[in-house]
Amino acid sequence: MGVWSIGFGNGYETNDVEEILEFCLKTYHGLTLPPTDEDGMPLDTNARNDAALPLIIGIDGRSGSGKTRLSGLLEQSLSAEGICVRVLNLDSIYPGWDGLEEGTKTWQEISRNLHKGKPASYREWDWHADAPGPEHTINPAQEIVIICEGVGAIAGTCDVRILVKAPNELRYRRAIDRDGETYRPHWERWAAQEEALFAAYSATYAQADIIYRTA
């Protein structure tokens, strides 16, 4: 079971993916289903139109913390409930190794449009060519749940904000194991951008709904 965190995040702290899934499902049903009377009849069918909008889940945290694994588990679990899920990895948006701030701003614009029911376009970053790649468009009318995973995710407009944490040494090992030696010279470079981002959006990160510790 989780405990209430008194540290960074001030949200519900847990290491149980099932608790996170339960929270996301309750939020999804709370947004899409109108309040009912004791007979189960809607009290005000015009109160909200959020059923036409996707639930946006932001999964944030420093490199190697376990964001990608959590997003995969949530995608699998929500899909098993019959819910259509789209995962957006911010790694595909950051414009290179110095692009964390710019990528976060791009995601903020995307998420604002989606939350208003408007289509949102972005250009994928081609890491091999170190250049902009193809353009993609997300149509909120065609999505039910969107999971945004990456550093800066909860700086966007999200219905659920999840902050993933792990010890620095473990994060480093995971990152190198995942990306290989090509990441090693960029570790400190990226970490400095993470620190700057967390400082710039400290109030937003303090409002995380859930803190998920992977170790």
Protein language model annotation of sequence segments:
Residues 1-15:
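Charged, amphipathic alpha-helical linker segments immediately N-terminal to NTP-binding catalytic cores
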Residues 62:
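P-loop (Walker A) phosphate-binding loop of NTP-binding proteins
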Residues 70:
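Hydrophobic positions on the alpha1 helix immediately C-terminal to the Walker A/P-loop
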Residues 181-215:
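Small-molecule kinase domains that catalyze NTP-dependent phosphoryl transfer to phosphate-bearing small molecules
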